[in-house]
C-alpha cells in the first residue's frame, strides 16, 4: 500500500536508476544521485524553500519530503512585506536558501532556522536512517505533501495544504487520460511556486518522467522557447493557453517544428 509519494519514487529509482530525472540548462541529475543527496537532508512541519527555479530547489523539495515534512516554495522576487506575511501565517520551522537570498528578511526574528546551502559540507553530513524510517512508517496518505500560497488579493496570502492522496488521485487521472509511459520529457515552464510544478514533480517521481526546468522568462520569447524545446527534445508540456496562442499567431511551428511533442 502506498502511503506517500516517496513509496512511488523509490519504486521508480529501482526501476530506472540511471534515467535522467531533472535537467536545467547544462545541469542534470539522475534518480540514483537524488537518493545520495537526499540521504543527508534535515513530522509534518512546514519548511520554506527560497531558491530560484533550479535543480537545487527540486532536491530541497524532495529532501523535505524525505524528512517527512512539508515543503513550501517561495518566489525569490517576493516583496518583503508579502514574504513576512507568509512567514507569520505559515510559521515554518526552517528556510532553505543561499547566500544571495538569506538576508531578505530577519529569519531569526520569526524563529525560523536558516539552512544555507552555500555553507553545507556534504562530506560531513550524517543521516540517522533508523529515525527517518520510523517517521516514514508513521505516514498516512492524508498527511500533507506541500503548501501553495494564494495570490494574497485579500491582503494576506493564504496557504493551501495539499496531501499525498490528492496527488495519487491527480496522477491516476492524468495517467488514464494521457497514457504516460515514463518516456515523457516534460518542459516545465511554470514557476516552482505554482501548483502545476508539484504535479510535474509527481510525474517524475511516479512514472520516471524527465523534467526539463525551463526559465520562466522564456514565456515572453516564443521563438527561443521553441528552440529550447527542440534542443531538449521535450515531448510533453502543460502550459497556459496564452503562450500557445502567441506561438500559433506567429506561425512559429512552421519554422521551429516540434515533431516529438505528443498529441
Which residue stretches match the model-derived regions?
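Acidic donor-binding helix in nucleotide-sugar-dependent glycosyltransferases
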Residues: 56, 63, 184-185, 200-203, ...
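Conserved AMP-binding/adenylation subdomain of ANL enzymes
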Residues: 158-185, 195-236
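His-Asp-centered acyl/peptidyl-transfer active-site segments
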Residues: 42-45, 182, 188, 256-260
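Structural signature of beta-strand start/N-cap positions in the alpha/beta core
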Residues: 56, 70, 146, 185, ...
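Carrier-protein-dependent adenylate-forming modules in NRPS/ANL systems
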Residues: 1-165, 178-179, 208
